[in-house]
Amino acid sequence: MTNIRKSHPLIKIINHSFIDLPAPSNISAWWNFGSLLGVCLTLQILTGLFLAMHYTSDTMTAFSSVTHICRDVNYGWIIRYLHANGASMFFICLYMHVGRGMYYGSYTFSETWNIGIMLLFTVMATAFMGYVLPWGQMSFWGATVITNLLSAIPYIGTELVEWIWGGFSVDKATLTRFFGFHFILPFIISALAGVHLLFLHETGSNNPSGITSDSDKIPFHPYYTIKDILGLLVLVLTLMLLVLFSPDLLGDPDNYIPANPLNTPPHIKPEWYFLFAYAILRSIPNKLGGVLALVLSILVLAIIPILHTSKQRGMMFRPLSQCLFWLLVADLLTLTWIGGQPVEHPFITIGQLASILYFSTLLILMPISGIIENRLLKW
């Protein structure tokens, strides 16, 4: 009798994706983040569903409904904070996952990489819209400032902003449509993640050495299922420490003040995971230039495969490129810090220098280091 796992049309797909999948024998813990992102997405969809049962997307009651969830709903507080801090964990895993792709040259799988960039944009859009829903001060002003950036687009900018707002300012129509989009986008993300996996399994996983591993494969289960559980335990422990001991550590105190269109907060800033892009936006004095730099700060990932000049795939045996990679990481941390600071001296200058360094490292220094390392191979 044939094993049902290998014969059943539906279970067969799961079997080929998670059980009998041939995986390289030497992939490290950096390959954990894909499965952790799947766990984060599932957690966000489930907690979000329970929150949506009690939330009302109306400007008069949105803030009160979130308060009601925390005070009156059974375990509502833990659901709300799991959702809010789960988003932070999602982005930590996401940035680690992208960083691993850049370090080990996984961007050479162009379809998988491009779908990944689409996923990154979609997750960022979803997180932004979710931040608007509690209708606190930072929700309202964050929505106003970020949507207003579209007015920098020539000719159609102003009409586009008013079309998105559903009026002449961020109001009830905006909140309702943002809730609708925030609810549907995670399911689109799930579908895109399926396509991402489909393309990945066409080629097989990359590995730290960057060379083909066709001759040395092991089954995904039990080896990597067990290995992924370790990463999962670390993720759950970190998340629960955040949720149970300091749930507001990564949030903004201004969001505990109900939205007031007549009172602007002293420092309008997005959630911490967008601060690097926000710093790049603010570092350019021109509005359209800032918006373009903001979009390009993420879109630059799409041209990394074109700029790959090295004969080696990953950075495992390329010390010069490794130095530049960690310089880029330090630069992104600097930008994140700058994004949370007020717009004054010396933060403006530091932000501008960090922004220049970010783009020049990715577009100029890394391709040059690849060429230099190719020359060094001949010595």
UniProtKB/Swiss-Prot annotation:
Mitochondrion as UniProt keyword: yes
Binding site for heme b b562: H83, H182
Cofactor(s), names only, from the UniProt record: heme b
InterPro entries found in the cross-reference section: Cyt_b/b6_C (IPR005798), Cyt_b/b6_C_sf (IPR036150), Cyt_b/b6_N (IPR005797), Cytb/b6-like_sf (IPR027387), Cytochrome_b (IPR030689), Cytochrome_b_C_euk/bac (IPR048260), Cytochrome_b_N_euk/bac (IPR048259), Di-haem_cyt_TM (IPR016174)
Cofactor: how bound: Binds 2 heme b groups non-covalently.
Cell compartment(s), UniProt: Mitochondrion inner membrane
Signal sequence, renumbered to the chain: none
CDD domains per the UniProt record, alphabetical: cytochrome_b_C, Cytochrome_b_N
GO CC annotation terms, alphabetical: membrane; mitochondrial inner membrane; respiratory chain complex III
Pfam families: Cytochrom_B_C, Cytochrome_B
One function term, GO molecular function aspect: metal ion binding
Cited PANTHER family: CYTOCHROME B (PTHR19271:SF16)
UniProt name for this protein: Cytochrome b
UniProt gene name: MT-CYB
